[in-house]
Every structure is written in structure tokens, then in C-alpha cells.
Regions:
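Conserved small/polar residues in nucleotide/adenosyl-binding loops
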Residues: 2, 7-16, 493-501
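Bacterial Sec-dependent N-terminal signal peptides
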Residues: 14-40
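Proteolytic maturation boundary segments
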Residues: 38-63, 250-338, 342-344, 403-407, ...
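Envelope-exposed proteins and targeting segments
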Residues: 49-51, 57-59, 71-75, 135-137, ...
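Active-site-adjacent, His/Asp/Glu-enriched structural segments that form or flank metal-binding
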Residues: 69-71, 79-194, 212, 222-240, ...
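Scaffold signal of the M16-like zinc-metallopeptidase fold and its non-catalytic homologs
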Residues: 103-105, 130-135, 151, 155-158, ...
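Acidic/histidine-enriched alpha-helical segments
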Residues: 110, 114-118, 167-185, 196, ...
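Structured mid-domain segments that build the active-site/substrate or prosthetic-cofactor binding neighborhood
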Residues: 319-399
Length: 501
């Protein structure tokens, strides 16, 4: 979707109750109470212009015709697997495997995959790329000139090979060890080092504590090639894979080619279960302070954890309603934070809030505040954003603030609707990848425009103020401060207490 997505409303019981309350508020304007309580939350429609299917082996595909740009298409394969699936002796292998997808497949040995794509204008590292994260791995071949003879067939064949036919040659594996070691040595930024330090404390006692995708160089430099092959065979399988093709193509023809090309990949009998690991709650705040000589400024993260919306609960209109509500909350709070930057001596350099995954975990969300502080007044910057969050929790927002934020939200939605025929391939691809990986809704802008314009006027500011009280509570707080390693710079110890508003 074009609009910023925010989600989550506290623990499961409170979220379900609040969704029902919001739906009642929306219906009450046109129904009597008996009709209201007889209603069930309707499902979110799926955009009729995307074709979605699933092969017998479990592989899912998404296909959409889009002519911007003309004669171009994007080809993606998303895997519901990342570094969280690694065992201790495999740390770094999800990322290593991503590298190996460009170092030899059954139909594209050696470097021929990159060579072929660059011959037709698809540049490695630009239009040909991939990423590995905690819970997912995604590969893309973008901006492909589909009017080039054989380009469509070849790109689908590449996706097929990534899915099931990597060669994983021992010599190529050994060559790649040094490449990844150099990447680890030269590309690890100060923020990445901070994140590695944060994980064990933020996720103590869980699988997330030691799952940074780059892994450990001890494993990367010493694992046996068969260990990588075992990981590939166990986790790269059709029931965890989704193909996305969007562009100036014939949808029927692409669907036929996908069925022909991918149906021969066998489903795995007795396949390992793909687990989604929980995140522990904490009654007392978790406080982290770290320094790095390459960190340019003092930055503080304030996380207020809450339960993530389960995948199966994202299919009804209530999820769009909570998304709308939480987005408006963060927009109003950010407007307040931005106002404080307009004074003669602002308390911080930058501050914002949002609601999304709790750092790296999809099973927990967090209402998150970020503040970049002045080095000579760190405590004021931190206390100011904490005070504004607490003020919003205790006293909520005014009708004037809400009217202004709602109007701005609806203006953005109107603009997206009016320009719906100008969307490029990448924006559709991102939506479909998120639908496959996380079950995020894909109603299409026309359906979303209709639904939001129906429900937004019926949701009062009092409902949003109730939600704010559930997003920020006295438990499940995590505060992390990161600053430069600089002589004379003192970082506060952060004996954390909620400030008075």
C-alpha cells in the first residue's frame, strides 16, 4: 500500500474487543443497535487485477499486468525463511546461501547467470539483487526488457533454479567465504554493530538473541559444504516460496509458464515446521546504553511492546480500521513533536514515532519513539519525547488535531486513488511480497479508497485515545541509547521512569 502501515493494539483480548468496538462505531451511523451487534467483520477484498494461485507442491504465485514502464517486468521469488531458522553451527548460512544463488545453478553454471542478465541490460547489484533478514529472503530480477526474445523464459528459469537447483559447488563455496568475511569487515556500520549488541539484551532467552543475518565469521570460514546443502534442502522448498511477476506481460501466458516450469519441483514429505518464535514480555524496563567511535550522534529508541496482529486476523476490515487508527495516532503525535522543533532552542535535533515490528521480531509489535539528541542536552531530548508520549497516553488528542490529521490522511488517499494508473511495477511487487510473507491485505487502491472513506468519518477521536492507552503501558518497555565514543561526552545512565506529562 502507498500509505504508511502501522499495526497492533495490545494483547489479543483487548485488540479483538477494540476491533469490535470500532466496527460498532462505524455501523451505528446507519444501523440500529440490534443490527449492529448482529454484524460480523466483513473480509477485505483482494484486488481483482492480481492473479494469485498455488501449485500442487505448495508454491504460490502472483501475476499482474502493468504497463509502467512499457516492455518491462519484475520477477521476484520470496522465501519464508531467514537467519532465525539457523542452528548454532549454521549462523550466517542463510545469508551465505543468498550469495551462492549467484554462483552457479543447474541451468546457469558459474557466473553465467549474471553474464546473461547483464547482456540484456539487467545490472547485478542494481536490478539483480537479493536480501536476507531474520524471517525472510527475497530475490529480484527487476526492470527486465520483456520484449527481448527469451527474456521471460530465462528469468522464470532463474527463479526455478534459485528455488530448487543450486549447484553449491565446494570450490565456489570456499571462494565465497572470503567475500563474506570482507563484507563483514568493511560494511558493518556503527548502527549494525549496535544492533548486534542490542539483540542479546532485548531478546534474552529467545531465538532472536543470536540471529543477526551476517552470522559469525567462525562459522562462515569453517562450516562444511554439506552443512550449507542441508540448510538449502531443508528450507528452500515450494510451500515456503512465492513467485511474483508484475509488468508489461500476458498474465495467462505467464501463469501457463509458471505451471509448466515449477510444477516439477517436488513437495517435501515430512517437511520441517516453519516456526514463528515468540518474544518474552518484561515487567521492568530493559535499558541499554552503548557507544561506537563511528556513531555520529546520540540516538535513543523507546520501544513499547505489544502483541502483533496474528496473520489470520489480517483478512477482515477490522485490520484496515486499526491500521487507520494507529496511523492517525502516530501522525498526530509526530505533529506535536515537529512543533517542538520550531521553538528558538528546540529540545532535540529530530524525533518521531511509529508502530511496527518490535525491532526484528514479527511476533511482537512495538509503539516506537526515536529521538536524536544534542550532545550538550541529551537528557532534555529524551525526557521531552517520553513526556509527549505519556501526555498522549494520559490525555489523548483533541478533536481539532484529529480533524486535521484525518483530512491529511484522506488527501493522501485521494491522491493515490487519482494516480492509480501511474503506479510502477515495484510498488505492486512490494505489496504482493508482503501479502505472501505476512498476509498483509492487498485490496487495491480502489477498494481501500472506498472502505476508508466509509469508516473514517465514523471513528471518533475518543476511540483513538483509547487505543493510545493500549499501545503504551507500564510494562514491556525497552529503551536503547546509542552515542559516539568521544572524549568528554557523558551518556546518561537512563534510570528509566515514565515522566509526568
Amino acid at each position: 500500500r502507498d500509505l504508511v502501515r502501522s499495526r497492533g493494539l495490545g494483547d489479543v483480548y483487548k485488540r479483538q474487543h477494540l476491533l469490535r468496538t470500532l466496527w460498532i462505531v462505524a455501523l451505528i451511523v446507519c444501523c440500529n443497535f440490534q443490527q449492529v451487534f448482529a454484524q460480523q467483520l466483513p473480509p477485505i477484498p483482494i484486488d481483482k487485477d492480481v492473479r494469485i494461485g498455488k501449485l500442487d507442491n505448495g508454491l504460490t504465485y502472483y501475476i499482474r499486468k502493468n504497463s509502467l514502464p512499457a516492455n518491462r517486468a519484475d520477477f521476484y521469488i520470496a522465501q519464508k525463511v531467514g537467519s532465525i531458522q539457523e542452528e548454532d553451527n549454521q549462523r550466517g548460512l542463510a545469508h551465505f546461501l543468498e550469495h551462492m544463488c549467484f554462483n552457479g545453478t543447474t541451468h546457469f553454471p558459474g557466473n553465467s547467470l549474471i553474464q546473461y542478465l547483464e547482456r540484456i541490460g539487467v545490472k547485478f547489484g542494481e536490478n539483480l539483487n537479493a536480501y536476507t533478514s531474520i524471517d525472510e529472503t527475497v530475490y529480484n530480477i527487476s526492470n527486465v526488457p520483456v520484449n527481448t526474445p527469451g527474456a521471460i523464459d530465462s528469468c522464470l528459469l532463474i527463479l526455478h533454479d534459485w528455488s530448487n537447483d543450486l549447484t553449491l559447488d565446494t570450490k565456489e563455496i570456499d571462494k565465497e567465504r572470503g567475500v563474506i568475511n570482507e563484507e563483514w569487515r568493511t560494511r558493518m556500520s556503527a548502527m549494525q554493530r549496535f544492533q548486534e549488541k542490542m539483540l542479546p539484551a532485548m531478546f534474552a532467552g529467545t531465538k532472536y538473541a543470536n540471529c543477526f543475518p551476517i552470522g559469525t565469521m567462525d562459522v562462515v570460514m569453517n562450516f562444511k559444504p554439506q552443512t550449507l546443502r542441508d540448510y538449502y534442502e531443508k528450507w528452500y522448498r515450494p510451500d515456503l516460496q512465492g513467485i511474483v511477476v508484475v509488468g508489461d506481460i500476458d498474465v495467462d501466458a505467464i501463469e501457463s509458464l509458471i505451471k509448466k516450469r515449477f510444477s516439477d519441483i517436488p513437495a517435501q514429505p515430512n517437511a520441517a515446521k516453519r516456526e514463528y518464535y515468540p518474544v518474552n514480555d518484561n515487567q521492568e524496563p530493559i535499558v541499554l546504553v552503548a557507544r561506537d567511535k563511528e556513531q555520529p550522534y546520540v540516538q535513543t529508541f523507546i520501544f513499547n511492546k505489544h502483541q502483533a496482529t496474528p496473520r489470520e486476523e489480517k483478512n477482515n476490515v477490522g485490520y484496515l480500521m486499526q491500521d487507520y487508527a494507529v496511523t492517525l495516532i502516530t501522525n498526530m503525535l509526530n505533529a506535536r513533536l515537529n512543533e517542538l522543533l520550531q521553538v528558538a532552542n528546540p529540545p532535540y535535533i529530530y524525533a518521531t514515532t511509529y508502530d511496527d515490528d518490535f525491532f526484528v521480531a514479527k511476533t511482537k509489535d512495538a509503539f516506537t519513539g526515536i529521538v536524536v539528541c544534542k550532545e550538550d542536552n541529551i537528557e532534555e531530548g529524551i525526557s521531552t519525547i517520553l513526556r509527549e508520549i505519556e501526555r498522549a497516553r494520559q490525555f489523548g488528542f483533541t478533536e481539532t488535531e484529529y480533524s486535521r490529521a484525518r483530512a491529511e490522511y484522506l488527501r493522501h488517499l485521494e491522491s493515490a486513488f487519482q494516480e492509480r494508473d501511474k503506479r510502477k511495477n515495484e510498488s505492486y511487487v512490494k505489496e504482493y511480497v508482503r501479502h505472501f510473507l505476512d498476509n498483509e491485505p492487498i485490496p487495491g487502491i480502489a477498494n481501500e479508497y472506498t472502505i476508508i472513506n466509509q469508516i473514517a468519518p465514523a471513528i471518533p477521536v475518543t476511540a483513538l485515545n483509547q487505543i493510545m492507552q493500549q499501545l503504551v503501558t507500564d510494562s514491556n518497555q525497552v529503551v536503547a541509547l546509542f552515542g559516539p565514543e568521544k572524549e568528554g561526552l557523558s551518556l546518561p545512565c537512563l534510570l528509566y521512569t515514565s515522566p509526568s506529562p
